[in-house]
Amino acid sequence: MFDVLMYLFETYVQSELDFMVDQDALTDELTRAGFQKPEIYKALSWLEQLAALHDSEDAPEYTACASDSFRIYASEEMLKLSTECRGFLLFLEQIRVLNCDTREIVIERLMELDSPEIELDDLKWVVMMVLFNLPGGENACHQMEELMFEPEAITIQ
């Protein structure tokens, strides 16, 4: 499923090409690209759930966390997210790429992936997808891109 998400993000979203709304045509194109239909359906469902967060009235605004807050991970989350991944999420909060709300969206989207354990690179791409989808997240998305592709260019404020 993650391969389908990456293909869609790189092909349509990140390249700013028009994203097909017709799910059948998109499914056919993804099948021609070599993806299996069950994986395509899972990925499209994952994206629909992410988009629903953007469209809902409960979409988080991009605000800072209270400096004294601390995230306690559930046992299922600890099994799926390594110490490295959890540390990276904390780092993203500390440099204000993520806030409390966006961190929770990222964790929720990571938990919905069908991988038993999340790799750090996969986490980074999910963060990009979430930030790209949220209104007001442009600066954070740009900072995340710099962190991914030009790690020496990131400035901690």
Swiss-Prot record:
Xref: Pfam families: DUF494
Species, as recorded: Tolumonas auensis (strain DSM 9187 / NBRC 110442 / TA 4)
Name this protein carries in UniProt: Protein Smg homolog
Family: Belongs to the Smg family.
Superkingdom as given in the UniProt entry: Bacteria
PANTHER family reported for this sequence: PROTEIN SMG (PTHR38692:SF1)
